[in-house]
Amino acid sequence: MSMLNHFFDYKPEVLALDEKALELCQPYFKQMEDIRDYNQLKMLKAFADTQMSSTDMLGTTGYGLWDSGRAKLEQIFAEVMGAEDALVRSQFQSGTHTLAVALFGLLRAGDTLLAATGRPYDTLEGVIGLDGKGKGTGTLMDYGIRNDEAPLKADFTPDYELIAQKAPGAKVCHIQRSRGYLQRNAFDLDTIRKVADTARAVNPDIIIFVDNCYGEFTQKEEPCQAGADLVVGSLIKNPGGGIAPTGGYIAGRKDLVELCAYRLNAPGLGKELGCTLETPRDMYLGFYYAPGVVCEAIKTAIYAQCLLELVGKKPIPRYCEAHNDIVTCFDAGTADALIGFCRGVQAASPVDSYAAPEPSPEPGYTDEVIMASGSFTQGSTIELSCDGPLREPYTCYLQGGLNFAASRAGVLLAVQNAYFKD
């Protein structure tokens, strides 16, 4: 009997699929483990270079002036990200908040934001003010900032000719690495570099801005090493390692990071303020563990993609393709299958496993969304979770997995719940 059946009730045909998937995935697991090892050594070197000490994890209160722990963490982030400077703060509430702070820090009235990889993720629509969303609440467009887009081509690749036409009038070129609610693979660093080169060829002063959410540590380099001036991400995704309880980061050119710090705090204050309270240890430890945790999440993705192919689905990316973020998307086919898959993930979660997810309205989203996340950190997507909008073709987005052993059990239960009901 499979070890899995000592703890969960799987059907024989589902266990047979598990065995086949594990066999097929082994060479792709090894590729990801090589990336993990490289990134972990890079991380270790950055910690050593910074001479971080145990007292740097104690935290500060009040203004947070002269916080050496905060400064060293930002130095480590900058080195690992291939950046000049970084802003790493628990005051960032989410990825969307971090992105908003960065965009407001860079753009002024009359400037143009060019979305070079098509319309951004749903939650940014309200930040920008697209289609009148958030009008009057202080969106970019409320402040006289213009928005332009270069839609992706039919094959979900950037339209480089259109980018070249639109970039001369733009202040910031926005690249979204991950897919949002599109059925495309995340962009690799070569694509990011080509978008950056295309925009700079016609506008040398344009700021290349990359939403790096879900993409950290999936390759051996980061977007700042592929032409980005500024990258932004969330600590409850990849770089927090499942340990950081909140926060976000902005990394890149020193002058641009400083502008973002003025926006987060206040003009004249910049990076000098921001107490860390009791968060430094978790942020240090989470970032240190992040390369290994991301590897576990991608191994989970590879396994899930293989398993889904074996039941006739067409996940993006395929298990045998390059992985540039931790997300897998596939068409569940029906609302029942989408709901069943999410409930299976929830049932094999360490937290709130007894809950049964239901579709519901979510702020920033057009359709009802169903979400499964039995995570230790609310909203964490480096922990095994899945979600999808209740609209045809009922696409499911699966991400995360702190360790492969537990995540494998969750994915297998989700597939059984969606496609092997009695």
Q: What are the functions of these language-model segments?
A:
Residues 63-69:
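N-terminal small-domain helix-loop-helix segment of the aminotransferase-like
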Residues 309-421:
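Conserved C-terminal alpha-helix-loop-beta "cap" of PLP-dependent enzymes
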Residues 60, 87-90, 326-331:
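Short glycine-rich or small-residue beta-strand-to-loop segments that form or flank ligand, phosphate
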Residues 71, 77-82, 90-91:
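Extended, compositionally biased flexible segments
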Residues 4-26, 33, 42-56, 65, ...:
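Conserved PLP-enzyme active-site core in the AAT-like
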